[in-house]
UniProtKB/Swiss-Prot annotation:
Any Pfam family matching the protein: Ribosomal_L34
Gene Ontology MF, one: structural constituent of ribosome
Gene3D superfamilies xref list: 1.10.287.3980
GO cellular component, one term: cyanelle
Subcellular compartments: Plastid, Cyanelle
Compositional bias (Basic residues): 30-46
Descriptive protein name: Large ribosomal subunit protein bL34c
Organism of derivation: Cyanophora paradoxa
Length: 46
């Protein structure tokens, strides 16, 4: 059997779109603010 085409790395996902990385950049903070305003249960996926 051949390998799957997409094998996501958990570490990469967390570093790119985790809570800490979101809260460190101005645009990321804007995303969190918008998700809080909308009433999202989960602010970030990881």
């Amino acid at each position: 059997m051949s390998k799957r085409t997409l094998e996501g790395s958990h570490r990469k996902k967390v570093r790119k779109s985790g809570f800490l990385s979101r809260s460190q950049s101005p645009t990321g903070r804007r995303i969190l603010k918008a998700r809080r305003k909308k009433g999202r249960k989960m602010l970030v996926k990881y």
